[in-house]
């Protein structure tokens, strides 16, 4: 099956593309895009991989599914397109960046600048129907993104996995903590940010670990 995805990932994903579940997922997604408003745009579904080739991955931030309002989703978890107001979770992420490492983040919510430094911004589900949060869950995306994590674990050393909230922590439960750094906290959503996200210092902890393991730090 010919799936347009960045070359360094494709090499490892070819067997995945041939599995029955993935073929069913592709048919489902094609039909959804043909008949409904789906986010992100079709050419942005695999943006996380295009912006962060496998050989450059140093950090993985796990999200749940894309933003479901017009113009927001751009294929990177927590990120929005240029010119779009910052969603509440991203406002809280930027607040923690400032409190943690003293950097005032850009007014832009586009996190490509993180991706290009080796931060894989990976949603568990890569598409969503407009105005319907979670509408494409349990269609096969979760299995695919689990395969992505397994590829990283097999091919990479000393990765920082940032797991915000219960959903991400359950999804990442199989990641071995003796070989990688796993940072867990509450989700940056306004409903939970005060329950352990604020003050968790994930950005400085990430950079400390990257330094310790001989990797270049992220300019958050």
Swiss-Prot record:
<comment type="function">
    <text>Excises uracil residues from the DNA which can arise as a result of misincorporation of dUMP residues by DNA polymerase or due to deamination of cytosine.</text>
</comment>
<dbReference type="InterPro" id="IPR005122">
    <property type="entry name" value="Uracil-DNA_glycosylase-like"/>
</dbReference>
<keyword id="KW-0378">Hydrolase</keyword>
<keyword id="KW-0963">Cytoplasm</keyword>
<dbReference type="InterPro" id="IPR036895">
    <property type="entry name" value="Uracil-DNA_glycosylase-like_sf"/>
</dbReference>
<keyword id="KW-0234">DNA repair</keyword>
<dbReference type="InterPro" id="IPR018085">
    <property type="entry name" value="Ura-DNA_Glyclase_AS"/>
</dbReference>
<protein>
    <recommendedName>
        <fullName>Uracil-DNA glycosylase</fullName>
        <ecNumber>3.2.2.27</ecNumber>
    </recommendedName>
</protein>
<dbReference type="GO" id="GO:0004844">
    <property type="term" value="F:uracil DNA N-glycosylase activity"/>
</dbReference>
<dbReference type="InterPro" id="IPR002043">
    <property type="entry name" value="UDG_fam1"/>
</dbReference>
<feature type="active site" description="Proton acceptor">
    <location>
        <position position="65"/>
    </location>
</feature>
<dbReference type="GO" id="GO:0097510">
    <property type="term" value="P:base-excision repair, AP site formation via deaminated base removal"/>
</dbReference>
<dbReference type="Pfam" id="PF03167">
    <property type="entry name" value="UDG"/>
</dbReference>
<keyword id="KW-0227">DNA damage</keyword>
<dbReference type="GO" id="GO:0005737">
    <property type="term" value="C:cytoplasm"/>
</dbReference>
<comment type="similarity">
    <text>Belongs to the uracil-DNA glycosylase (UDG) superfamily. UNG family.</text>
</comment>
